[in-house]
Amino acid sequence: MKKRILGFLSLPLFFLVGCTNKDVAVSGTITIKEVEIEDVSSLEVYNINLKSGFSSFGAKIVCLNDDSKKKRAVITASSDLIEKVSIKESGATLKISASSHERYLTDSCEIYLYNCVFNSINLASATQMIANDGTLREDKLDIDLKGASSLEINKLALNEIDVELSGASSFKASKIELNDASFDLSGASNVKIESLIADDIELSLAGASSFKASGSVDKIEVDASGASKVDMINVSSSKVSGHLSGASSGYFSFRGSLKLDLSGASTLYYLGDSSSLDVSTSGGSSVKKYN
């Protein structure tokens, strides 16, 4: 897991780069271009900076399967923009990008990736991605989202997942079943999982980030700071431990033990046996029964 300070240092740089982009008008008819793909397992999407009116955004990526089994990328955009977007393979990595110094004045850029299975996803520049069933590996999955990027998945069953979000990025899932999970959030990033089944989960949140889930997790380890929020009141757990600091809040439901260190006006809301609480508080922090 990367050190927290790197996330904070990258935020000003990201916005500085965004402000110095040159606006480039693109025209031409909406065109569809297909690019054949070999055997790739990693995806990187970056520097596709788009603007329409007052809104700035990135490319939309959709991963899906069809009966052809043919690995390919299909991009739909104006003919001018298609010429500026690079889709190439570098070893086992599929890289999709454009110029880091340009922002394209257009309504959309959609890229469909067919019959690829990824174990590593790196998105930047406000990229929006939807990963359908069967497009993500079921052993170990690494996800890194930067600069207001987002990833949405339906259901996933796997051994291990490592998620790192920064710069107001987001991760959403309907259902995840796994053994071990690690989530590292900074810069007002957020995670929402409707149904989470896991053995162990490690959470690290900073900079007004948020994590919300329902389900069942055996062991939860949390470190939340900078007005972050962890809402796992609808997650049944046997053991919760960690730290809340800097006006952060944690909502937990436990059936075994809960051991937390609260500081800097942080708040713990809990459901469970109060006799099993082991909580230290300082700096105006508080512990409250959830109702």
Model-predicted regions and their roles:
Residues K2-N291:
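Intrinsically disordered, low-complexity terminal regions
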